[in-house]
């Protein structure tokens, strides 16, 4: 009988240690999966001279960000618009303005699990991908 209880105790100890390791790995993975708000320098690095592509309000788009502050957006339906973009270094926000806009539209850029998101106070996070260079079509 003593032999059985020692054997069970040993198995219990192994299972307990294994569960602890699994829990520790789970907690560590959660810590690494936190969203990060990009700085103005990081926003500039990913956008400047590159194209963002994704879906905005259900419409597929490609938007190029030229180093001179010009931005071109082309949607899947063929709609094309040329505007301006810049970065507010104090608030670390991306800003854009298109013909007809009264004010600059501001968005935060977030990174979560190596994916980028546009984030504002009024819209849910919207995922986008970066294409290197000018890739509007």
Question: What positions do the PLM features span?
Answer:
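Bacterial N-terminal signal peptides that target proteins for export
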Residues: 5-19
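Generic short amphipathic/hydrophobic targeting helices enriched at N-termini
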Residues: 9-11, 23, 32
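Intrinsically disordered, low-complexity peptide-like regions
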Residues: 12-15, 30, 86
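Bacterial N-terminal signal peptides
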Residues: 20-28
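Lipid interaction determinants
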Residues: 29-84, 91-137
């Amino acid at each position: 009988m003593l032999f059985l209880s020692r054997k069970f105790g040993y198995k219990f100890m192994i299972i307990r240690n294994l569960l602890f390791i699994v829990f520790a790995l789970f907690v560590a993975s959660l810590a690494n999966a936190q969203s990060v708000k990009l700085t103005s320098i990081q926003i500039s690095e990913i956008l400047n001279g590159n194209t963002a592509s994704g879906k905005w309000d259900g419409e597929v788009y490609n938007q190029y960000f030229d180093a001179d502050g010009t931005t071109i957006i082309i949607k899947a339906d063929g709609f094309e618009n040329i505007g301006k973009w810049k970065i507010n270094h104090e608030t670390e926000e991306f800003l854009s303005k298109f013909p007809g806009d009264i004010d600059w539209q501001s968005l935060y850029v977030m990174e979560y699990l190596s994916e980028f998101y546009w984030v504002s106070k009024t819209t849910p996070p919207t995922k986008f991908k970066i294409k290197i260079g000018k890739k509007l079509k």
